[in-house]
């Protein structure tokens, strides 16, 4: 059975291209001659015939396999025929004209080998004479004489390498492992990955594996990585993205499963070696014998045509890309001398810019967000301006001031804003005299393939990718994971799987058709250079547009010049590079370029396209979701309802004063126009009491003082700077509170000669036992110097040991607040180093208007309000400092520019309120918005009922759980004109728009900007006149506003602690509570999280006690509930009610955890700033002492006071919990040991009688935890520690560097003799007078 390589009936030389085409067409012919045509037999007869033939084939192969010992001829025959019958469609092999004609490639079978069935007759056995030379060249020395029927496609594919001289074959008998693989492993894998199961039954084994992965990932993130973040937040993100990528995998697998696998096995077989072909059939996908079920000819023909259509576009056309019309895909005869007509556009261009610097090019930008300017440069001097207007509204209706078609002429030829970067929705790509071909064409891997032109770079810091279909606005997605974001010139193009082009074609046709419906009001923009205006149809834009939730705020380097019209790109880079990288406002870019962001109601016919479009629509919701979860993860209250103290007002009114807390009273010092006995005043807001204390040392004290700042240590207040008796001062005054009716003034002697200059508007902040002075205004210039005052030695010193960082610019009227080991400085009025004036943000050639802007923005000697945040890192170890500029998340808002606002600490957060901002004429505009800066450096705007009127130079202080605003300066008559409501960020008088929150830009006068943006309009004179009138009106309003400003006397407050729903405890039906999950469990009870009346609650469900009768248990339970219900205090956990069946107590839910977790949690790299500082330690100590004082006034002993029973709310207010074992004093004289050993008093451990002083001992142990951050008796077993405490007087060891005032209090509280321990009333007084 040997024969030569030419004995197979085929010519040794390859056939012509025409013959190859005929042979392939004969294999793919599914026309009227197919087995289901009108002239053929029925499908049932044909199936019967095929079954009989298949049984004959099986019998033949049984005999064939049994006769394998006859020689290698059968092996060669089987291997050769297996390779030859693997039918490959036309797309498996398309060679370029320059490729070697003798090269060949392998083919892979997908299971259906009946392509040669004609006229209803069974196919004749295939011999090597029937195989095209292009499909297989047999260079063997053995002949095949016996014709062989069609092989069963379930046989294992093998790998064969054929050459001109020899052929190496492998044993075709499947090994034991291959049999197991074919019979067990492959069906199992196919069953697991089969997506139809999840559709039919809602579940498949792959989802079980994913579920385990999700649970494990959430556990790792919540326990080791993101300890401070709620597990619910992590769960939502993990589940969302896992399901999202799984759905994407299902879409890609469904669309490209039948075609992509075939292309992978044959795309790399096109080599230029001499007559050498390597065939790898292991990667071919054989999925069983499909001869028993043959699809209808229409279905199969449609599938074949779709495959052919896909692989026709795999190799790029031989036509040069520079000479191709992208609309019709036809060559351009003379591209070098032809200007681009209107039907030539780039596939990804939605907002394009001019790049020809040799010509005088004027780029026009429509300020009404209705035009999309596409400037295509040619070799000629003429410029084409393509205006694509996708808005249904008339352009004349989009500007309130009547500036309808204002043009902005700039010297820069390439106008790119931050949003036109690589991460934006639109890629700015223009190639001179070049138009890109179809978006789904891919370059061939052959040696003569045409490489696409290089991409223009967008700057040194940006890697621009070719994103023809940038459906995802986020850059976290791998740029090489999909076809849509691949780079030009990639070396792995042939090996990468890709979505079929028909999917993209349907998607683009859908978008183009959708956009074309809105193309009703296209207009041309007139250039001053009389350039030709060409209107390009929207249908040619092959860039998808997605819809996002509407928003009027602009995040990034954009300015909003009008409240209802965001119409100006503000930042232009002179060297034609992208300025920034803000991905959040891609929809804003579309609006600014005239592209409609509203999706059409047209429904695509392709199911996969529908599913993908739904995925894209869902991805747009991630922006708002991320912003919401960021705010939730910070633990910041987003709503505060301010209320006015009805019966209490300041007498007299005050502004520019200082306010502090002493005990339960508020202390007011100084103020503008305040003199005499009212210079110092005590206020009790709840009881409406005003006390002017007796002043001693009055001759030393100031006659009047305002615009100063102070620091406090105990009962001493250190005041520096400001106006004293109407003059700027640099003198230091000390006010000592002797008691509630007496204060004493003194002026200490300063040692050394380094004394700060006189100033006002500075900040004076306490850090440890030192005072930090920063900034101010000395009457001539702003300052940014930094001083330190040692109160013990009264010595000033300048800070010189700053390790690095950028020092904040000179400023005054700012705020400085200690947050951990950081000094946070925000806002103020001074010199803006980043943008000295806003002319740098305007693209305008009109020098007169530039001068007008310069004059308006540089009022008050060139000083402007600021909204930057700077951080001074404080290191107590080496007393070194380092400046940093705070960076915030891109999707977050930040407060607008302001000065003379107020800020204070609330837990681990900073609350900032109010302030002022000068308008273009220098008139102050008061603000009233409220913001919170978390310890994670995340700003959050607080909603709720706002105080009124807006104000600045007021006092802000936290007393207990309440925030107070006292006095200030504002407009008390025209509230509506001066204040904003709801979500407005700032307020202004009539005619001025609200300030827009941006990250890096400063707002400018809106009317002046509109004036500048309308210089190229035919109605220029009229617009200028209108703007001048507006300016005059604004000036008049502002002057009136300035005249109406007055000193205020009102007091506003807000409670930061959740108030109880009702004043008394009521019985609650257990069915009314929606139980969520179990959050804790103990020996006597378990705690469940639930919801009652729309409020999160904690349900403490008691376990049944078999030793007690039910009636006895109910009586004790009711007594405990009544006791808890009567204890309404801000520092005690609120009890809402109870239920008898089952027995449970409903209490408020506190999700922030307990004090033990806060102190002893191991800080990660991201949590270094969470360290407890002296301010927070003092606040926590005060809260515990106040809560326990309230318990003891009711003759109640807690008996289990420890850090794990001290819960915290969102503002880190302490709530004393676990009062279940608390008893009245008369019932606890002889009870046995209760509580935790480390926090239990020694008299209880000795089983002696005890009283309220046992809780004082526990309080001392909690203070030890706060001061040291360590657990008590660490390393000693609890039982041994209890014995040593009870018998040997063991106590935890305080470190040597502990503050002596704190050490004194701790030692006092854990005295061995209970009678020597202080009461909680004495503790609160000690804290007030000492710290």
Curated annotation (Swiss-Prot):
S-S pairs: none
Enzyme class: transferase
Compositionally biased residues, Polar residues: 288-299, 436-450, 532-555
Entry's localization field: Membrane
Catalytic activity as recorded in UniProt: L-seryl-[protein] + ATP = O-phospho-L-seryl-[protein] + ADP + H(+); L-threonyl-[protein] + ATP = O-phospho-L-threonyl-[protein] + ADP + H(+)
Annotated residues for binding of ATP: 1079-1087, 1100
Location of the active site: 1200
Predominant subcellular localization, coarse grouping: membrane
Protein name: Probable serine/threonine-protein kinase DDB_G0272254
Residue ranges with Low complexity bias: 1-42, 96-116, 153-175, 259-287, 514-531, 557-577, 834-860
Cellular component per GO, a single term: cytoplasm
């Amino acid at each position: 059975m040997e024969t030569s390589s030419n004995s197979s009936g085929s010519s040794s030389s390859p056939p012509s291209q025409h013959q190859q085409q005929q042979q392939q067409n004969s294999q793919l012919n599914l026309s009227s001659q197919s087995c289901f045509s009108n002239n053929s037999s029925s499908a049932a007869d044909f199936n019967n015939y095929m079954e009989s033939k298949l049984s004959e084939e099986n019998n033949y192969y049984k005999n064939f396999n049994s006769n394998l010992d006859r020689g290698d001829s059968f092996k060669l025959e089987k291997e050769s025929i297996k390779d030859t019958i693997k039918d490959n469609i036309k797309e498996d092999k398309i060679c370029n004209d320059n490729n070697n004609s003798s090269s060949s490639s392998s083919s892979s079978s997908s299971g259906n080998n009946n392509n040669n069935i004609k006229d209803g007759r069974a196919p004749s056995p295939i011999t090597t004479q029937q195989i095209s030379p292009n499909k297989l060249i047999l260079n063997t020395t053995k002949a095949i004489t016996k014709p062989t029927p069609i092989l069963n496609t379930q046989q294992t594919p093998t790998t064969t390498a054929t050459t001109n001289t020899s052929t190496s074959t492998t044993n075709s008998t499947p090994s034991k492992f291959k049999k197991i693989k074919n019979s067990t492993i492959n069906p199992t894998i196919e069953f697991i990955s089969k997506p139809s199961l999840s559709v039919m039954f809602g579940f498949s084994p792959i989802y079980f594996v994913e579920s385990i992965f999700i649970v494990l990932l959430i556990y790792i993130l919540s326990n080791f990585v993101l300890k401070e973040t709620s597990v619910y937040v992590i769960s939502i993100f993990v589940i969302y993205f896992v399901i999202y990528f799984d759905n994407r995998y299902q879409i890609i697998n469904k669309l490209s499963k039948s075609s992509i696998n075939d292309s992978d096995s044959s795309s790399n077989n096109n080599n230029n070696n001499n007559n050498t072909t390597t065939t790898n059939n292991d990667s071919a996908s054989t999925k069983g014998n499909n001869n028993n079920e043959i699809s209808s000819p229409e279905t199969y023909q449609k599938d074949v045509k779709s495959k052919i259509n896909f692989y026709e576009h795999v190799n790029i056309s031989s036509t040069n890309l520079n000479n191709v019309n992208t609309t019709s895909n036809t060559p351009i005869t003379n591209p070098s001398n032809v200007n681009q007509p209107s039907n030539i556009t780039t596939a990804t261009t939605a907002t394009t810019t001019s790049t020809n610097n040799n010509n005088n090019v004027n780029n026009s930008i429509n300020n009404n967000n209705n035009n999309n300017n596409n400037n295509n440069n040619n070799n000629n001097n003429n410029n084409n301006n393509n205006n694509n207007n996708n808005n249904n509204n008339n352009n004349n209706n989009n500007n309130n001031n009547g500036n309808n078609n204002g043009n902005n002429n700039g010297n820069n030829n390439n106008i790119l804003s931050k949003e036109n970067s690589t991460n934006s929705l639109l890629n700015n790509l223009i190639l001179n005299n070049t138009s890109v071909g179809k978006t789904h064409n891919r370059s061939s891997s052959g040696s003569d393939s045409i490489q696409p032109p290089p991409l223009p770079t967008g700057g040194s810091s940006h890697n621009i990718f070719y994103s023809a279909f940038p459906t995802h606005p986020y850059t976290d997605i791998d740029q090489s994971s999909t076809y849509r974001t691949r780079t030009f010139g990639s070396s792995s193009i042939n090996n990468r799987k890709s979505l079929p082009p028909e999917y993209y074609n349907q998607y683009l046709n859908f978008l183009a058709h959708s956009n074309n419906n809105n193309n009703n009001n296209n207009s041309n923009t007139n250039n001053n250079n009389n350039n030709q205006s060409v209107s390009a149809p929207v249908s040619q834009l092959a860039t998808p547009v997605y819809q996002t939730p509407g928003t009027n705020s602009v995040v990034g380097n954009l300015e909003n010049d009008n409240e209802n019209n965001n119409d100006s790109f503000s930042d232009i880079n002179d060297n034609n590079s992208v300025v920034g990288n803000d991905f959040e406002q891609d929809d804003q870019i579309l609006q600014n370029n005239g592209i409609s962001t509203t999706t059409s109601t047209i429904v695509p016919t392709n199911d996969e396209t529908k599913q993908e479009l739904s995925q894209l629509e869902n991805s747009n919701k991630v922006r708002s979701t991320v912003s919401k979860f960021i705010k939730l993860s910070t633990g910041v209250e987003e709503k505060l309802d301010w209320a006015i103290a009805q019966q209490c007002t300041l007498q007299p009114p005050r502004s520019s004063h200082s306010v502090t807390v002493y005990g339960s009273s508020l202390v007011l010092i100084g103020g503008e126009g305040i003199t005499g006995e009212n210079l110092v005043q005590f206020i009790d807001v709840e009881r409406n009491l005003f006390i002017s204390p007796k002043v001693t040392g009055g001759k030393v004290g100031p006659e009047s003082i305002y615009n100063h700042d102070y620091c406090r240590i105990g009962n001493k207040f250190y005041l520096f700077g400001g106006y004293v008796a109407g003059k700027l001062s640099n003198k230091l005054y000390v006010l000592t509170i002797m008691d509630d009716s007496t204060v004493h003034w003194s002026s200490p002697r300063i040692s050394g000669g380094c004394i700060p200059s006189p100033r006002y508007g500075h900040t004076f902040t306490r850090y440890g036992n030192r005072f930090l002075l920063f900034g101010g205004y000395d009457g001539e210039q702003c300052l940014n110097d930094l001083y330190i005052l040692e109160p013990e030695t009264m010595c000033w010193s300048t800070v010189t040991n700053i390790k690095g960082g950028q020092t904040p610019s000179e400023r005054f009227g700012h705020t400085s607040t200690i947050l951990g080991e950081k000094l946070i400085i925000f806002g103020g009025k001074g010199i803006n180093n980043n943008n000295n004036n806003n002319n740098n943000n305007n693209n305008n050639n009109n020098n007169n208007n530039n001068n007008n802007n310069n004059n308006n923005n540089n009022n008050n000697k060139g000083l402007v309000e600021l909204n930057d945040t700077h951080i001074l890192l404080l290191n107590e170890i080496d007393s070194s400092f380092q400046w940093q500029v705070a960076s915030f998340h891109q999707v977050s808002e930040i407060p607008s520019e302001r000065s003379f606002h107020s800020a204070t600490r609330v837990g681990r957060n900073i609350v900032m309120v109010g302030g002022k901002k000068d308008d273009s004429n220098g008139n102050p505009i008061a603000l009233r918005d409220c913001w919170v800066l978390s310890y994670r450096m995340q700003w959050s705007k607080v909603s709720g009922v706002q105080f009124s009127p807006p104000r600045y130079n007021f006092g802000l202080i936290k007393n207990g759980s309440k925030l107070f605003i006292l006095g200030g300066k504002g407009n008390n008559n025209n509230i509506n004109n001066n204040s904003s409501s709801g979500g407005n960020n700032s307020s202004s008088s009539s005619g001025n728009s609200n300030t827009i929150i941006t990250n890096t830009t400063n707002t400018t006068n809106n009317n002046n900007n509109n004036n500048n943006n309308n210089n190229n309009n035919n109605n220029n004179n009229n617009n200028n006149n209108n703007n001048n009138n507006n300016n005059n009106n604004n000036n008049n309003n502002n002057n009136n506003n300035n005249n109406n400003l007055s000193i205020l006397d009102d007091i506003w407050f807000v409670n930061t602690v959740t108030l109880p729903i009702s004043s008394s405890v009521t019985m609650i039906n257990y069915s009314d509570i929606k139980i969520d999950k179990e959050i804790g469990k103990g020996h006597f009870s378990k705690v469940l999280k639930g919801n009652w009346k729309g409020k999160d609650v904690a349900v403490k469900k008691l376990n049944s006690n078999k030793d007690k009768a039910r009636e006895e248990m109910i009586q004790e339970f009711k007594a405990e509930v009544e006791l808890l219900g009567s204890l309404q205090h801000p520092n005690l956990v609120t009890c809402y009610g109870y239920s008898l069946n089952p027995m449970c107590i409903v209490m408020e839910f506190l999700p922030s955890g307990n004090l033990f977790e806060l102190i002893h949690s191991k800080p990660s790299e991201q949590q270094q700033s969470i360290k407890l500082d002296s301010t927070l330690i003092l606040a926590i100590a005060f809260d515990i002492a106040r809560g326990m004082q309230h318990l003891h006034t009711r003759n109640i002993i807690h008996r289990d006071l420890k850090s794990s029973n001290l819960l915290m709310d969102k503002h880190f207010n302490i709530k004393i919990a676990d009062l279940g074992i608390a008893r009245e004093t008369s019932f606890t004289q002889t009870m046995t040991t209760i509580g935790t050993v480390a926090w239990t008093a020694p008299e209880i451990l000795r089983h002696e009688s005890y009283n309220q002083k046992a809780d004082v001992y526990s309080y001392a142990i909690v203070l030890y935890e706060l001061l040291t951050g360590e657990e008590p008796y660490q390393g000693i077993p609890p039982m041994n520690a209890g014995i040593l405490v009870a018998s040997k007087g063991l106590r935890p060891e305080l470190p040597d560097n502990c503050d002596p005032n704190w050490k004194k209090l701790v030692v006092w509280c854990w005295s061995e003799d209970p009678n020597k321990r202080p009461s909680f009333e004495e503790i609160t007084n000690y804290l007030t007078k000492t710290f």
